[in-house]
Regions:
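Hydrophobic, glycine- and aromatic-enriched re-entrant/interface helices and adjoining loop segments
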Residues: 12-114, 138-140
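A juxtamembrane structural motif centered on a specific transmembrane helix
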Residues: 154-206
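Alpha-helical membrane-inserting segments
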Residues: 3, 20-28, 153-156, 160
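Transmembrane helix-bundle signature of multi-pass membrane transporters/permeases
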Residues: 16, 92-93, 104-107, 147-151, ...
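Hydrophobic transmembrane alpha-helices and their immediate junctions
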Residues: 111-155
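Structural signal for the C-terminal ends of transmembrane alpha-helices
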Residues: 1-8, 122-132, 193-201
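Transmembrane alpha-helix boundary/anchor motif
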Residues: 23-24, 33, 37, 120-127, ...
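Membrane-interfacial segments
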Residues: 7, 28, 32-33, 129-136, ...
Length: 206
């Protein structure tokens, strides 16, 4: 909507309406929305120590928090420069090659390595938005805005999962996490952005 040039009052109005709808749905239909373990993942972020007794048993609590707990420890143990890609102390994180690849990067390459990885992704997002802003075709602008926004949201959610700020929902880190369908769709998105860029760049041969 922002890329289409709509007024902020319409965008904020739509956001407020969506927020109200979600609040009403949770207030009256919370018992029918989501499965038990999905709620546990949300509650594990809000109350990781289970002080409110949201988990029915200690075994369930430990199982729910285990992956994020190990990921947090792995990132923290990496320090500034990490423990080395093939050496040093490594903290095992379940399925680290998927959703928690950032925890492995943090453990191996440290804070600096994470900054480099996220910096590359940030540059890609900025370039995507810039390509859309320079596009003379509205469709091209919409494509770049949508892809840039989706990438930005995906990166933010994955980082939040790894830092234990958001619940685990299976969102990958673009271009770094394993996953055939995810990588395929990302390359398709990059191809679309490159197509928009090429159609708005003068040819060297006139």
């Amino acid at each position: 909507m922002f890329a289409a040039g709509l007024s902020w009052k319409y965008i904020l109005g739509a956001a407020a309406a969506a927020g109200a709808a979600v609040a009403v749905a949770f207030a009256f239909f919370s018992d029918k929305i989501g499965k038990g373990y999905q709620w546990y993942r949300i509650l594990a972020v809000i109350d990781p120590e289970n002080t409110t007794g949201w988990a029915p048993s200690e075994a369930v609590w430990k199982n729910i928090i285990y992956q994020q707990q190990r990921g947090e420890i792995a990132i923290g143990s990496g320090g500034i420069f990490g423990n080395g890609l093939f050496g040093g102390r490594y903290y095992s994180v379940p399925n680290a090659h998927n959703d928690f690849i950032l925890s492995w990067i943090g453990n191996s390459a440290g804070f600096v390595g994470c900054c480099v990885v996220l910096g590359v992704l940030f540059a890609l997002v900025v370039k995507t938005f810039a390509t859309g802003a320079r596009s003379e075709d509205l469709l091209g602008s919409y494509i770049c805005a949508g892809i840039g926004g989706a990438l930005m949201a995906q990166i933010a959610v994955n980082v939040g999962m790894n830092l234990r700020l958001l619940p685990v929902i299976g969102v990958t880190l673009p271009f770094y996490s394993a996953g055939g369908s995810s990588v395929l769709m990302l390359y398709i998105c990059v191809g679309l952005v490159l197509s928009v860029y090429s159609h708005n760049t003068k040819s060297l041969f006139g």
